[in-house]
Amino acid sequence: MMISCTRTAILPLRRRLMTASTAYPIKFASSIIPGYGRGSADLGIPTANIPIDDVPVLDALDTGIYYGLVQILKTDKPSEKKTSEFQKDRVVDFQYTNKLNDQEINAVLPMVMSVGWNPFYKNDQKSAEIHIIHKFAHTFYGASIKVMVLGYLRPEKNFTSLEALVDEIHNDIKVSEEKMEGTREKKDQFWQ
């Protein structure tokens, strides 16, 4: 697994948290795992969840909302059923990239990412959830991805209602799109 950061000597990260003023971009590769199933079901905002323990730079980041770019890599594996890490009674169909179209595979797409505890839902595990700003017809659990975090939008916070949470996420998406308009990072060697 490749992890990169523009800071020098990033390890050990856990004692030296990376903050909103961290040097960007932060680049890493990972795979998509099932989460709690709330992004699509409760919020109407599907997320690609990343195993935070496998990407030390994510665990070292301040909790909050980040923006950047993501690329879903072609994953040649047959579909299979697996149990969700977050909900042991939930069996998920791992499609990898089998049902994605050619324009979605390897495309560099904008994203917003939540890193934290999701106080509205009172999570007991820290998570990293990426909302890719694109409408997908199918899921792609198990797919490999590359992620480039370009900046920090805001700290993690609690909300008084589900509607307030959804409104804030939509605002995060809007701000993220504005910040990334015309970004040259889409042509970075990282995506090759």
From Swiss-Prot:
Organism of this sequence: Yarrowia lipolytica (strain CLIB 122 / E 150)
Highest taxon listed in the record's lineage: Eukaryota
Gene Ontology molecular functions: ATP binding; metal ion binding; riboflavin kinase activity
Membrane-spanning ranges: none
Gene that this sequence comes from: FMN1
Tagged with keyword Cytoplasm: no
Reaction(s) the record says it catalyses: riboflavin + ATP = FMN + ADP + H(+)
Ligand binding (Mg(2+)): 47, 49
Free-text comment on the cofactor: Zinc or magnesium.
UniProt KW S-adenosyl-L-methionine keyword: no
Pfam family, one: Flavokinase
Protein name per UniProt: Riboflavin kinase
InterPro entries in the cross-refs: Riboflavin_kinase, Riboflavin_kinase_bac/euk, Riboflavin_kinase_dom_sf
Catalytic site positions: 129
Similarity remark: Belongs to the flavokinase family.
One Gene Ontology cellular component: mitochondrion
Function: Catalyzes the phosphorylation of riboflavin (vitamin B2) to form flavin mononucleotide (FMN) coenzyme.
Keywords in alphabetical order: ATP-binding, Flavoprotein, FMN, Kinase, Magnesium, Metal-binding, Nucleotide-binding, Transferase, Zinc
UniProt xrefs under PANTHER family: RIBOFLAVIN KINASE, RIBOFLAVIN KINASE/FMN ADENYLYLTRANSFERASE
GO biological process entries: FMN biosynthetic process; riboflavin biosynthetic process; riboflavin metabolic process
